[in-house]
């Protein structure tokens, strides 16, 4: 038998598959088909998910393991901050370690166990890097600028300013009013910039942020390859960096920032060290279900409730209790 774990960070949900425990690793095509099968919100297992997190042997010296991120549409993301926290917890428990590095597509990133947010709400801190601002890194074009940092971009939305940051996933960020973050614009701009458009040829994650107060934000994200998600760890990290750079009177380097999102909350700390930016992302790493399945069913992307054994952990109830009194927005325009 093989194992899957249903997990979430700020209710950005995933299945974890540890390929090092399989007799035969899945091919890239099999991983893509499995991700599309498991994560479908209509027909997938346990109501679907936002992606599949694949654990492999490390590819760089000094790392404990490698994490790959397969989106719900079968595309591969270079990183996932919320997913990395859950993989960090899995590896910490698998190998009995508290601090270590995990390989991602672009870098080996430091992770560590943190104090629980609440009873049965375990938390992990993960490094989010590298950071790039140049248009080739995202990429974008035809916007009249080589970089966007609080820049008016009338081609996208005449009334807003935008920042573009690859961290390493590409993110477009705008600080907006509560009315705008609750309204339909993000649900229009996100699909447009992730379809055939003249500006972002590879698509882009689009983040709207509302400043609640000093060191307090609310962030809503339309994710490339997924759509609206409850939270996006790299999006929150990129938004926190833009917040410190553009709104220094409200947030500062090396100070904790509380970031609320539709799925809960996280904390970030923005750093500038050795002439490089990086962000520390701290949040929950919740396991909701353990799943036992025949390895052949993984290879054939035929996992369903009838051919696997599912055990709930009880951690979701603790998480829901934790977020019960957090600030909430009326996000009625969810697409």
Residue ranges, per PLM feature:
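A glycine-rich beta-to-alpha transition motif near the start of alpha/beta enzyme domains, typified by
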Residues: 1-121, 173-335
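Internal active-site segments that recognize and position negatively charged phosphoryl groups
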Residues: 151-182
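Transmembrane helix-loop-helix hairpins in multi-pass inner-membrane proteins
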Residues: 123-125, 131
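Active-site glycine-rich loop that binds ribose-phosphate moieties when present
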Residues: 133-135, 139-160
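Flexible, active-site-adjacent loop/turn segments at secondary-structure boundaries
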Residues: 136-138, 165, 204, 291
């Amino acid at each position: 038998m093989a194992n899957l774990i249903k997990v979430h960070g700020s209710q950005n949900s995933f299945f974890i598959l540890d390929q090092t425990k399989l007799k035969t690793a899945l091919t890239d095509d099999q991983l893509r088909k499995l991700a599309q099968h498991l994560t479908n919100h209509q027909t997938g297992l346990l109501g679907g998910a936002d992606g599949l997190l694949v654990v492999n042997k490390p590819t760089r010296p000094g790392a404990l393991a490698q994490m790959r991120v397969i989106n719900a549409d079968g595309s591969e993301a270079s990183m996932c901050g919320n997913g990395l926290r859950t993989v960090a917890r899995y590896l910490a428990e698998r190998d009995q370690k508290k601090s270590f590095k995990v390989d991602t597509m672009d870098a080996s990133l430091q992770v560590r166990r943190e104090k629980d947010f609440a009873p049965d709400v375990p938390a992990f801190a993960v490094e989010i890097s590298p950071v790039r601002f140049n248009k080739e890194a995202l990429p974008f074009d035809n916007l009249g600028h080589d970089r966007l940092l609080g820049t008016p971009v009338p081609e996208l939305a005449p009334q807003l300013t935008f920042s573009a940051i690859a961290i390493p996933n590409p993110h477009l960020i705008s600080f907006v009013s509560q009315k705008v973050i609750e309204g339909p614009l993000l649900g229009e701009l996100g699909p447009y910039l992730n379809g055939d458009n003249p500006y972002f040829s590879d698509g882009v994650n689009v983040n709207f942020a509302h400043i609640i107060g000093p060191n307090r934000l609310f962030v809503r994200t339309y994710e490339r390859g997924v759509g609206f998600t409850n939270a996006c760890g790299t999006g929150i990290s990129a938004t926190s960096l833009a917040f410190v750079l553009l709104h220094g009177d409200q947030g500062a380097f090396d100070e904790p920032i509380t970031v609320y999102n539709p799925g809960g909350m996280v904390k970030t700390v923005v750093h500038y060290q050795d002439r490089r930016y990086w962000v520390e992302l701290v949040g929950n790493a919740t396991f909701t279900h353990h799943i036992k399945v025949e390895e052949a069913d993984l290879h054939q992307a035929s996992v369903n409730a009838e051919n696997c054994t599912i055990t709930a952990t009880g951690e979701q109830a603790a998480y829901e209790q934790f977020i019960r009194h957090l600030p909430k927005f009326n996000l009625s325009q969810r697409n």
